[in-house]
A protein has these predicted regions:
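Charged regulatory segments coupled to nucleotide-binding catalytic modules in large multidomain enzymes
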Residues: 1, 254-413
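Interdomain "switch/hinge" adjacent to the Bergerat
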Residues: 1-7, 41-98, 124, 130-299, ...
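Conserved short strand/loop->alpha-helix "switch" segment adjacent to the catalytic nucleotide/phosphoryl-transfer site
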Residues: 5-30
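Conserved ABC ATPase signature
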Residues: 19, 98-102
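Alpha-helical scaffold elements adjacent to nucleotide-binding pockets in ATP/GTP-utilizing enzyme cores
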Residues: 31, 83-87, 107-111, 187-190, ...
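A generic secondary-structure signal for well-formed alpha-helical elements
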Residues: 35, 39, 115-119, 195-199, ...
Length: 413
């Protein structure tokens, strides 16, 4: 295997360096992000389907069509000389300022064996295959002037990590198939949810129009800047107290949120990086129920702080969410961020449900009157949406835990 493009790294080495599982949809997400960053206004995604199961004639076997590849075509800037230079370097710095890690294209090869890239800039035509045997010499460039720029990338041959048959000689081994189900509406929802913040910012801040067309056979779905979810915003700043310079770093955090009334719609509450979902809110700030059961609350917290601290796979933080100690790598632990976030969430809730505070106080008083021996623990309840049953249940748990600690500390003689 050649190493000319990566100096000390082979592509195999790079793929082995990823510590976390790569979701099957990651290449699709990465290429959409790349197209948007290349200023594309129109992105067409043609998803190919494994039709092998349609040949099965047994009516007792449920046929599940799955995605086995896709082609994405955009009208962005094309594969420029800077892009080519960046493509041949592991962890390139080209897009670091917008939260990119410089490794996204390598996650493609965890999912697909073969990737074909074709592109036209204003003055150059580029074509090459990207696979585990890729080298810089594989890139074919030709001078070609054109007013029409585009990039076309085709993904095929799913790796055995995501699709493989069990070894018949190993009884406990099972078939593996982690490919996306070919449900075009579900895939549209997946993309819309993942890029909820990014789509909103492109539309509101950059004032850009865009259209993403999804196709599976004769089916099609469209995502545009006209039908994206509108979001409200609140923000706060946190000082990096480990920064002892004359001008210590303040990090800005933006909470994007909205209420929806679609019962069938899943609500999203997540930390974000580079406009993309990274990790769900921890339990201390998560809102799982509202005074009105027909309303959902979506919340997405974004910050440069998160942009700088995500894994290479870009699907989690590079620090533990349970860390409470400040370090040079993680100077603002998540618990500190959440403490700043809590009053913002309470403010959002009270704006929507102005009686919430008095209703909560009433529930606490009723709980104390019903079980006065739990008064101390009832008053410690920090839930934002209180119900009598839940408050009493949590207070009972705290009471029993304290009682058990007392018994263990003073054992009977």
């Amino acid at each position: 295997m050649t190493t000319s493009a990566y100096v000390r790294y082979t592509i195999g080495d790079i793929l082995e360096s990823f510590n976390q599982p790569i979701p099957f949809e990651q290449p699709l997400i990465e290429t959409i992000a790349n197209s948007l960053e290349a200023n594309a206004s129109e992105i067409e995604i043609i998803l190919s389907v494994d039709e092998s199961q349609t040949q099965i004639e047994d009516k007792n076997i449920k046929i599940i069509r799955r995605i086995n590849g896709f082609t994405i075509i955009d009208n962005g800037d094309g594969f420029t000389s800077q892009n080519i230079d960046s493509f041949t370097k592991f962890k390139s710095n080209l897009k670091r300022k917008i939260g990119c890690k410089g490794v996204g294209r390598f996650t493609w090869l965890k999912v697909f064996e073969d990737i074909k890239i074709e592109s036209q800039t204003t003055d150059t035509y580029v074509k090459f295959d990207f696979n585990k045997n890729f080298s810089i010499d594989s890139i074919n460039t030709q001078e070609n002037f054109s007013s029409k720029t585009y990039t076309k990338i085709t993904f095929s041959n799913v790796t055995t990590t995501y699709k493989r048959f069990a070894n018949p000689n190993k009884k406990k081994e099972k078939d593996i198939d982690e490919r996306l189900i070919a449900d075009i509406k579900a895939i549209k929802e997946l993309i819309s949810t993942h890029f909820l913040v990014k789509f909103f910012l492109i539309h509101e801040r950059e004032k850009r129009n865009f259209k993403i067309i999804l196709k599976i056979g004769d089916e099609s779905e469209i995502i545009t800047n006209e039908n994206i979810t509108k979001l409200n915003k609140k923000e706060f700043d946190i000082l990096d107290t480990t920064d002892n310079s004359l001008n210590p770093q303040y990090y800005n955090f933006e909470l994007f949120y909205n209420y929806t009334t679609n019962k069938n719609e899943k609500f999203v509450q997540s930390y974000c990086s580079a406009g993309r979902l990274i990790a769900p809110f921890t339990d201390s700030v998560k809102i799982t129920s509202l005074p009105s059961p027909d309303i959902n609350l979506n919340m997405l917290l974004a910050s440069k702080y998160f942009d700088e601290r995500t894994t290479e796979e870009r699907n989690d933080f590079s620090f533990s969410k349970n860390d409470v100690n400040k370090t040079t790598v993680n100077p603002i632990p998540l618990n500190e961020i959440n403490e700043k976030l809590k009053p913002i969430i309470e403010e959002i809730l009270l704006e929507k449900f102005p009686k919430l505070e008095s209703d909560n106080d009433k529930i606490l008083q009723e709980c104390i009157e019903e079980r006065p021996y739990l008064g101390k623990y009832i008053r410690q309840d920090t839930s934002k949406i209180k119900t009598k049953a839940k408050v009493l249940d949590e207070a009972e748990k705290a009471y029993k835990k304290k009682k058990m600690m007392f018994v263990n500390h003073f054992p009977r003689c």
